[in-house]
Regions:
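A cross-family phosphate/adenosyl-ligand binding-site feature
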Residues: 1-139
Length: 139
């Protein structure tokens, strides 16, 4: 898919250990001249961890994308009626978020963005970041 001139939502959930690598991918995406709207789950938006300060990640995303972070269900809800995204990328997508998506639960900014975007029949790309043992059920 040629991304120049396309509008892309880039949603991040709480797999904090992957944030530095994911932000590098956002930079690559920005280099394609796509118009990027960052979306962060409430947890990703507000939680400081050993991998970095939330405010630093938010600031960096806004600088790269040139748009404010969508960070609430109310803000994400607008994606549906306006149908302004051509593509929604969820990276990293935690196992918890994946389970919510699979069951139609839209109680966070990211899951609501996905629901609203899918309403328009447009593609969602999910990059799962979770422990493989969680996915296959091994203890």
């Amino acid at each position: 898919m040629e991304l120049k001139g396309k509008t892309v939502g880039f949603a991040m959930t709480g797999s904090f250990c992957t944030f530095a690598r994911v932000i590098k991918e956002v930079e690559k995406l920005a280099a394609t001249n796509a118009d990027i709207f960052p979306i962060m789950s409430e947890t990703a938006y507000s939680t400081d961890t050993r991998f970095g300060e939330a405010a630093d990640f938010v600031s960096r995303l806004q600088m790269i994308c040139g748009n404010p972070v969508i960070k609430s269900v109310k803000e994400a809800e607008r994606i549906g009626p306006t149908s302004y995204l051509d593509l929604l990328i969820i990276a990293p997508c935690t196992g918890n978020t994946l389970a919510k998506l699979a069951n139609g639960i839209a109680d966070s900014s990211v899951t609501m963005a996905a629901k609203a975007h899918l309403r328009g029949g447009k593609p969602v790309l999910v990059a799962v970041s979770t422990n493989v043992f969680v996915i296959i059920g091994i203890r």
